């Protein structure tokens, strides 16, 4: 009796300079935000893949509160930004980025951030980052109704935190800024396109 077995796909190493890889990657990508930090983070990641990729930024609604609460709500905001950007442009894929906060069982609070990538075939990728404990004084202001960025502006006596170094830049004393924290999660969300053989259903052969 013939037995079926799954064929393992052939994998290749991505060096960032593969002509074969570039021929199947996107040439036009949209990002669902005009926030300069978000746009710069996407641009930096795409430049490591293919400098010639066209990036279009569009202002879209996230469909969630200005201060998302919890990973699920933050993910939903990122997804809805990506979907709206795809609908509003002629891009082949779109990226949505959303930052939020998570209330933990012990009453403390942490930050979170998510990236969602969608393309016109319906494929989706998601990546998360920025799980960082928030000081009690920051958490208290968020519980009172402030956004994280506005709370940081008030406490650090600055302006435009979320359009610059971000809360993470202040709370890590500049060790990493918001753009630097966003770049890894964008890379994670692109994994299904960067290494598609790992994500496609394996072929089945029969002896």
Q: Model-flagged regions — what are they?
A:
Residues 1-3, 19-20:
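Acidic, Ala/Val/Gly-enriched low-complexity intrinsically disordered segments
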Residues 11-14, 21:
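Aromatic (phenylalanine/tyrosine) cluster motif
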Residues 15, 31, 95-98:
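Short glycine-rich loop/turn motifs that provide flexible caps or phosphate-binding loops at active sites
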Residues 22-91:
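N-terminal polybasic phosphate/anion-binding patch
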Residues 67-207:
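Anionic-ligand binding patches
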């Amino acid at each position: 009796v013939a037995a079926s077995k799954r064929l393992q796909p052939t994998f290749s190493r991505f060096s960032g300079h593969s002509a074969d890889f570039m021929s199947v990657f996107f040439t036009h990508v949209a990002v669902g935000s005009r926030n300069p930090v978000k746009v710069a983070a996407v641009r930096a990641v795409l430049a490591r893949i293919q400098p010639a990729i066209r990036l279009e930024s569009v202002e879209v609604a996230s469909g969630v509160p200005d201060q998302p609460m919890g990973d699920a709500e933050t993910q939903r905001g990122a997804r809805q930004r990506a979907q709206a950007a795809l609908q509003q442009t002629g891009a082949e894929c779109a990226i949505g980025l959303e930052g939020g906060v998570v209330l933990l069982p012990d009453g403390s609070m942490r930050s979170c951030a998510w990236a969602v990538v969608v393309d016109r075939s319906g494929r989706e990728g998601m990546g998360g980052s920025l799980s960082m404990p928030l000081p009690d004084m920051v958490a208290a202001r968020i519980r009172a109704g402030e956004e994280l960025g506005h709370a940081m502006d008030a406490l650090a006596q600055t302006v435009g935190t979320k359009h610059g170094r971000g809360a993470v830049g202040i709370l890590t004393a500049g060790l990493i800024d918001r753009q630097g924290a966003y770049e890894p999660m964008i890379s994670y969300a692109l994994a299904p396109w960067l290494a598609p053989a790992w994500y496609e259903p394996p072929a089945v052969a029969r002896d």
